[in-house]
Amino acid sequence: EIFWPCKNIAEDQFEFFALDPEDWAECEDKGGEILGVVHSHPVGSSEPSDGDRASSEYIGYPYHIYSVEHKSWNIVKPSGWKAPSLIGRRWVWGQQDCWTVICDWFKETKNIDIPYWHRPKSIKSFLNSPEFQYALPKLKFQKQETTDKIKKGDVLLMMGPRKKLSHVALYIGDQLILHHEANKLSCRELYDLGYIEATKEVYRYAA
């Protein structure tokens, strides 16, 4: 067995952990069997966070967690775990992000299962070529003619930091949106002028 180091590319590396997809791909290319992922908690216990559980589910491997403060180990394995709440989730690409929180809202509030959409394994690949405009119609969301007549449950396609349509939020009524930005916690926020101007397209679910 060997240990293959991978970079943490999260913006806040003290609070978040995100594997570098290029390092991960290089590890896979070596041809050996991947047994799991090892990472540390600088402060606090080795108890798996929701982000650890979500990451383990997403990549399909155990997470071995070491607490630097307490000098202890823990492990979490894929088991079908899902985040218990729509609010306060840690961001994990493909498992807890802007799209999955919308899918989970539809399941929890309307008992609607949005079909699985196969996305790139890394956020970097997705940001280079966002696919929401092509995927939403295939998932039974109809594009609306205007962005100023939104209703509860509408998906708002927004311009991201790279000037591409790479972020989605859900309008939940009362001038509020539910969304999950990269490397932040999922939250409800006021649909203010900044978000209104960022919204370029609106999609409505039509069974």
What are these regions (language model features)?
Residues 78-89:
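Active-site-adjacent structural segments surrounding the nucleophilic cysteine of cysteine proteases
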